[in-house]
Amino acid sequence: MSTIVDEPTYPYSKKLVEALNQVIPEALARPARAKNFERVHSLFKTKQLHLVLLSKSNAKALLEGSGPFSDFGAVNVRTLYAFGDMLLLVQPDFPDSNVWLLADAFKKIHSRLPGALTPQQIMVLPNLHPSALLAFRGIPIP
């Protein structure tokens, strides 16, 4: 999921979906776009959507309940991957095996995604999902 008001996220989410579907076709990934930050917060907080792509400043605001999310409260999230100034966030209780599969896919395709950090750069990010770290280290799926 991305949001209209966090402008670069929706076009980039379409690139992510296309790349993921090439590596994990059974995922049947497709982009989703919320109309505003309130809707992002609602869908993510209620676990109707498990992944969200936000600019780093908005990702931090979602985690802290600040900035555009100050009226809605903080949300517990983990980082899955980073692309330039954007972070792909995941629900902490999203199945570990799914997080591992996504992280492993990004490990394989990061060079095809504009601005994507390398797995080595991702491994030192704060708040990284533990299963993503396992995938980047080459440790088998949990």
Predicted regions and their residues:
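A bilobed periplasmic-binding-protein/Venus flytrap-type ligand-binding module shared by bacterial periplasmic
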Residues: S2-T3, L80-N98
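Solvent-exposed loop/turn segments at secondary-structure junctions
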Residues: D6-P8, S57-K60, F94-D96
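Extracytoplasmic "Venus flytrap"
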Residues: M1-K14
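An extracytoplasmic/periplasmic, membrane-proximal ligand-sensing/linker region
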Residues: S111-P142
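Short helix-initiation/N-cap motifs at beta->coil->alpha
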Residues: P25-S42, M123, N127-L128
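Short beta-strand->loop
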Residues: S66-A82
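A ligand-binding cleft/hinge motif common to bilobed small-molecule-binding domains
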Residues: H50-D71
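Extracytoplasmic/secreted proteins, especially bacterial periplasmic and envelope-associated proteins
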Residues: P11-K15, A19, R39, L43, ...
